[in-house]
């Protein structure tokens, strides 16, 4: 019997034994219906653009189908940008802003250096398509929230309604603020639980949102602390050996898929990875190690629909964190710059040219 076969058999036996347990921890309902039952903050609504831009969701999904057909990896990249936006200042598209004379933008902060630049281009292209059809009425923050949802759906995950009506921020966070608000991959379960609780996200939300790692890639330095100088004892040895081949040194520039079983499919295999001690980050694997979150991991591993149901609820909750609504903020014409910046840039260039002629 080969080692790989033994691992598969062990996985199967674990899942079978867990399926024999009666699970009353979570109720299961249809994800789309459940999402509509989620509470929404004042200023957002399920049909915000019904009159101003009724086809906005169709425009975005149609374009993303083309984009992901060329590069499915962009689905995970867009989803990650949405997470990184919401966890810093709230879901107001500040992560999309490029740096300015006031300083570097959020994209220059260490946790955001590995965000794919092409994904930002995709968001701006969506902005242009929507604006061409409807005018400047749909915010970049709403476009990003819808694009994140469609990244999940078009990768095989659940469809869900997205409350709309967000406005775009007028400023980006400092690099320090950005760094301090994004949970690092070396956080353990206790640190994650506390961090999420500060955002009114509970333990189930934490485990469900972590399931976003079922797609995408990670750069070696984000997890090699578990390999060098000493190997994390919670890591499967065969998995560790594979990672060491991918990342021969702690600072290797190589990348590794987050989910070794189905890296480009949004499913529940991420939780199966954790049960087999094949989670990539400490923040992943410790969800199975810690008794407070282990049961949720096990439940999601054996019931994909259960995971989908709770993921959609958690995404809707996260997508409403510290949103701007009404007359707050603005609706950007270009997602990477404030509306006034285009004019100011021209003015500054004119002043510089005039000074050079003196």
UniProtKB/Swiss-Prot annotation:
- Report the locations given in the UniProt record: Secreted; Vacuole
**Which cysteine pairs are joined by S-S bonds?**
53-134, 86-91, 140-335, 220-247
Report the cofactors: heme b; Ca(2+)
Question: According to its UniProt entry, what is the function of this protein?
Answer: Removal of H(2)O(2), oxidation of toxic reductants, biosynthesis and degradation of lignin, suberization, auxin catabolism, response to environmental stresses such as wounding, pathogen attack and oxidative stress. These functions might be dependent on each isozyme/isoform in each plant tissue.
Q: Where is the active site?
A: 84
Q: How is the cofactor bound?
A: Binds 1 heme b (iron(II)-protoporphyrin IX) group per subunit. Binds 2 calcium ions per subunit.
User: What is the source species?
Assistant: Arabidopsis thaliana
Q: Which CDD domains match?
A: secretory_peroxidase
Question: What is the protein name for this chain?
Answer: Peroxidase 12
Listed A to Z, the keywords are: Calcium, Disulfide bond, Glycoprotein, Heme, Hydrogen peroxide, Iron, Metal-binding, Oxidoreductase, Peroxidase, Secreted, Signal, Vacuole
Q: Which residues bind heme b?
A: 213
Q: Which residues bind substrate?
A: 183
What tissue specificity is annotated for this entry? Expressed in roots and leaves.
What are the GO cellular component annotations? extracellular region; mitochondrion; plant-type cell wall; plant-type vacuole; plasmodesma
EC nos: 1.11.1.7
Q: What is the residue range of the signal peptide feature?
A: 1-31
Residues bearing attached sugar chains per UniProt:
188, 202, 251, 334
Q: Which residues bind Ca(2+) 2?
A: 214, 259, 262, 267
Induction summary: Induced either by incompatible fungal pathogen attack, or by methyl jasmonate, a plant defense-related signaling molecule.
Which reaction equations make up its catalytic activity?
2 a phenolic donor + H2O2 = 2 a phenolic radical donor + 2 H2O
List the molecular function annotations (GO) for this entry.
Answer: heme binding; lactoperoxidase activity; metal ion binding
Q: Which family does it belong to?
A: Belongs to the peroxidase family. Classical plant (class III) peroxidase subfamily.
What gene name is given for the protein in this entry? PER12
Instruction: Look up the further comments and give them.
Output: There are 73 peroxidase genes in A.thaliana.
């Amino acid at each position: 019997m080969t080692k790989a076969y033994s691992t598969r058999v062990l996985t199967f036996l674990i899942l079978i034994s867990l399926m024999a347990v009666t699970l009353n921890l979570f109720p299961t309902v249809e994800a789309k219906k459940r999402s509509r039952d989620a509470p929404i903050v004042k200023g957002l609504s399920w049909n915000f653009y019904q009159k101003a831009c009724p086809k906005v969701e169709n425009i975005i999904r149609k374009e993303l189908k083309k984009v992901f057909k060329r590069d499915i990896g962009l689905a995970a990249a867009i989803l990650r940008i949405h997470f990184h936006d919401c966890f810093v200042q709230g879901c107001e598209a500040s992560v999309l802003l490029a740096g300015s004379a006031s300083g570097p933008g959020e994209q220059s902060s260490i946790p955001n250096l590995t965000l794919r630049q092409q994904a930002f281009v995709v968001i701006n292209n969506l902005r242009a398509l929507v604006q061409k059809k409807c005018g400047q009425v749909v915010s970049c923050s709403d476009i990003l929230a819808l694009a994140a949802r469609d990244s999940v759906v078009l990768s095989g995950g659940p469809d869900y309604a997205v409350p709309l009506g967000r406005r775009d921020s007028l400023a980006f966070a400092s690099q320090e603020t950005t760094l301090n608000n994004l949970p690092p991959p070396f956080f353990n379960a206790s640190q994650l639980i506390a961090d999420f609780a500060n955002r009114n996200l509970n333990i189930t939300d934490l485990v469900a949102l972590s399931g976003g790692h079922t797609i995408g890639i990670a750069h070696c330095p984000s997890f090699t602390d578990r390999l060098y100088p000493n190997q994390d004892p919670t890591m499967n040895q065969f998995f560790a050996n594979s990672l060491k081949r991918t990342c021969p040194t702690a600072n290797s520039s190589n990348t590794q898929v987050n989910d070794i079983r189905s890296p480009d499919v949004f499913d529940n295999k991420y939780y199966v990875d954790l049960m087999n001690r094949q989670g990539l980050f400490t923040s992943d694997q410790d969800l199975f190690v810690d008794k407070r979150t282990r049961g949720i991991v096990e439940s999601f591993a054996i019931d994909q629909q259960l995971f989908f149901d709770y993921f959609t609820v958690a995404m809707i909750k996260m997508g409403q964190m510290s949103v701007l609504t009404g007359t707050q903020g603005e609706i950007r014409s270009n997602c990477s710059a404030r509306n006034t910046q285009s004019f100011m840039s021209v003015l500054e260039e004119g002043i510089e040219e005039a000074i050079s002629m003196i």
